[in-house]
Amino acid sequence: MADVFPLILGIIILLASVISIKTGISVTVVEIAVGVIIGNLGLFHSESWMIYIASFGGILLTFLAGVEIDVDLMKDNFKESFTIGFLSFLIPFVIVFLVTYYIIGWELNPALLTSTALSETSIAVVYSVLTQKGLFKYKIGKLIMVATFITDICTAIALSVLFTKFDIYTLLFYVVSLAVLVMAYYKSDLFFENPLFKNKIGELEIKYVFVLLLGFIFFGSLGGGQAILPAFILGVILSDHFKKHTKGEVKARFKTVAFAIITPIFFIIGGMKVSIPLIYSCFGIFLTLFVLRQLSKYIGVYYPSKIFLKQNYNYVTMMMSTGLTFGLVAAVFGLNNALINQTEYSVITGILVLSAILPTFVAEKYYTPVHSEDLGD
């Protein structure tokens, strides 16, 4: 019998885009919500190839987010970005850990894993929303992206330091990642500037980057590392090539490939992983941790944003309060390594998905900067 699930997936992706356009809600939010619904109603079952594409989609989004980083802006606004990004990580991490370990009574590893997963800000959600709203051309969008980068670097470091079991393969992952990043910095012109390869129908520039990202994923899984951090740094390294040498043409083609099919699978599969029955069985814990996470994110982002920014601090706070990408990576890592159980995994994932939907909806509905004087230069 022919496999009907790829066709169903294609229809779901198309319908999510139609709903997004009709309602004005971010397609990212719609895709996650659809994933939650179809997953819990048993209307769709993910296959192994979909799960792999979903994981690759998260890495690809992370790379594209890195491409959008303005290095000059990061240097010029490092104090603001670092303060907002670091507090966005630190305060949720500390508060969630104290509550899960000392009040709820979870064991040390689940408490640490949960606090790590819930401290992140979703690069994928932030990047998708800022791209769809066209905010990357303005200072506010770039500032949010840099602050998100700082937050997730802290999360990645925490996950690596607290849980990674270092062995020869872990060392290999870091050595290979460093070598690839150095090579990409010095040798990428061979693909981006060579007339033999540049702007050809074969899209060698895109395939070149895909190979590097797949390499990060392979060596990361081999050595227990996380491909998100080197993927993001690769994007930052190649951002200059995309901006100066290709005049944005390759980046535009990258976005077409990513947003047409790959990233929708990431968001839909992410939503499908939420088990509503398991969340319902410990709804009090779920609600408590969700509220604590959002409040601690608010405290960590709103007040420094209000100090550094004359306006739009509500929008910055809402966008920095989103969660999903690296939190899902941390949750899957914890489940696969028996650091958390299925119920704890569902609670973490449910909180991440809800935090991807609600703050994004509020930000877009009430706080999106619309006037040129609101956006900055």
Language-model features: where?
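Membrane-interface junctions of multi-pass transporters
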Residues: 19-23, 36-80, 195-205, 211-288
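Membrane-interface helix-loop-helix junctions at boundaries between adjacent transmembrane segments
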Residues: 101-115, 125-170
